[in-house]
């Protein structure tokens, strides 16, 4: 892959506490989210505890607000928080780079979620080049009532489809470095869109709604189905958010 990644002000909350008894106890506010080794938070914490032979146990509570299976790296962000939290809690002294090397074993997006900010991601997503902050803008996020797995997104990926808009990554990098918001937006694209939108037309409806209500551009995030719209004005974004809520196309 080759893509630009950017953190936004949307987050889950992970609370971590030591306990005398060995083992990891993970709880969450979402009933269908697993709380064993299938959960990336559990997997990340266990990896560090096994490596450093930590005898104490952990109690972790995960309050999820980022939608599940939404193409927003929510699970990867949670795993990154577990790496950072366990490192601090037990005073392991691992640097950010050392955490990132371990994080890729849990998931391709996890090293970026440890680093955060604006970055060019290559390889499977683990080769990261830090970039200057994206030019200041407002981002509206809407998730329709469907879930799309990464596996489904890749199964429906047709790179030779004329409808596929290939992003100009080099042009985006230059625009970001120059603080050129319009230049960045004009070079954006998501190759997953045609395959996913053909299965879930509501994604296109959300894009159209955002763009007809002031977004410079609306696009699917990652493998979808979440859509984000970029605005240069908060009032425009707030009005678009109200219209989106009324439409009930997305949350």
Please state what every model-predicted region is.
Residues 6-7, 104-105, 111-114, 130-135, ...:
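Solvent-exposed alpha-helices and their adjacent loops that cap or buttress functional pockets
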Residues 20-34, 82, 178-188:
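Short, basic/glycine-rich phosphate-binding loops at helix/coil junctions
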Residues 1-70, 88, 92-97, 134, ...:
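ATP-binding N-lobe of GHMP and related small-molecule kinases
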Residues 248-251:
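Conserved short beta-strand edge segments in small beta-sheet-based binding/regulatory domains
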Residues 61-90, 108, 216-231:
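Glycine/serine-rich anion-binding loops at beta->alpha junctions
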Residues 115, 120-217, 232-235, 242-246:
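Conserved, helical-rich catalytic subdomain that frames metal- and/or nucleotide-binding sites
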Residues 14-16, 41, 75, 109, ...:
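Residue-level signal for inorganic ion chemistry
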Residues 57, 83-120:
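Contiguous, small/hydrophobic- and glycine-enriched helical/loop subdomains that border
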